[in-house]
Amino acid sequence: MTVDRRSVLRGLAAAALGGTVGCGRDPLARGRQSVSLWFSYGGKNREVLERMVARYNASQQAVYVQATFQGDYFEALAKLRTAIVAGAAPAMSHVVGEVVPYLHEAGVLEPLDGYPGAADLGLVRALAQEGTYTPTEPKPLVALPFNRSTPILYWNGSMLEKARLTVPDTWDALRDAAKALTNRSGDRVSTWGLECPISWWFWVALVGQAGGEVMRQDGYPLLGEEAGVEALQLWQRMVHEDRTMRPPPGRDYNAWQVTNQDFLAGRAAMIYTSTAFLRYLEDNATFPVRAAPLPGFRRRAVPTGGTFFVLMRGAPEGEKRAAWDFLRWMMLPDQTIEWATSTGYMPVATEAVTRLEQDGFYKKSPNDRVAMDQLQHAMPWPWAASLFRVQRECVDPRLEEAVLNRRDARELLAEARKQALEDT
């Protein structure tokens, strides 16, 4: 029997829907243009998104959005790529910023410039496509921001006050604070001074603070050059020499979850993680949660993170029009305010930021202001199709090896650069 590859892939893509295929449809969907959205928000953020989708569906009679959870960002992206090959992709999804150039160059993203109102969305430039990437020749609009973030420093307010410390704003001050906050009895540590996932995003922040860049505008993998080495060496020193930093176990977002849980349990006095977890940490902590910009070294620098909404070029025209109506609704100030104030992500509409300032939101919730203030130090990503592959295949696997096994940082980054160039 001949097995058709596309039939197999369509089956895999259908399985990726996670049980929604064949389920009874919401009566609200009858007589409307139905359109699918694959998403990756978990926990409280998932609840917020599903609430907003339900509100959109109830607000009009023409479009019905079927939102389906697909796992974390990387799990969802793997499913999306399988579905694209199979011709069974959803009309819309959201993807990490590092993969947008690759998907665009592959020709699978719908250009959005010609859709009604695309030129008048009023987005925060640093969070929108035009400000997220290094300037190159003009690119079509293919991605709309929504859950956008930066890494920030969180600390246990009670512990910092008890230790009579000020918030660290340099690498040296961070090391000193971590030493003062680490609680050790022999080889047993009850509280670590700092916990940070050993992953790409946080390493990129350190590279920028040391004055480096991960890539040139033409896509050449600099990997920070000497700054990349210094970034890894900071982690190595704090883990092995100072013994004040815990690298959390687990890969990808599992390590992020461990970091959050250790912080809430008092096992970490300070953590590096995303502003996306702000509301979750505040709601679940038994101590005052405080946030601050990441400490600098030669300069202040942070990468932006989170994801962009994208439309699939191969979707039926009716579904694309329906998806655009939903995405345009999600870009409106009311929706971006609801999303930001309910989660900790940054509002992507300039009018939303203005309204939050005028209403005194940031005075009442200063932690929410931290990521917005950091945008003045945001590092643009290169518009390079190889960026995501360099992240996932060349750099990420080596970071943990460098820190946990204390391999030579310069040697490992040279290996990563060599692999990146060979695969180009």
Model regions: which residues?
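N-terminal export signals
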Residues: 7-25
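Extracytoplasmic "Venus flytrap"/periplasmic binding protein-like
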Residues: 55, 59-126, 158-169, 261-262, ...
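Extracytoplasmic/periplasmic substrate-recognition and gating elements
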Residues: 58-59, 66, 139, 162-163, ...
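Hinge/lid segment of periplasmic solute-binding proteins
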Residues: 97-152, 175, 290, 360-365, ...
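Long, aromatic- and glycine/proline-rich binding clefts that accommodate carbohydrate-like moieties
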Residues: 124-134, 289-292, 341-393, 401
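Extracytoplasmic/periplasmic solute-binding protein
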Residues: 134-146, 151, 175-222, 227, ...
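Conserved C-terminal helix/tail region of periplasmic/extracytoplasmic solute-binding proteins
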Residues: 161, 373-424
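Glycine-centered hinge/linker elements that transmit conformational signals in sensory
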Residues: 178-180, 220-252
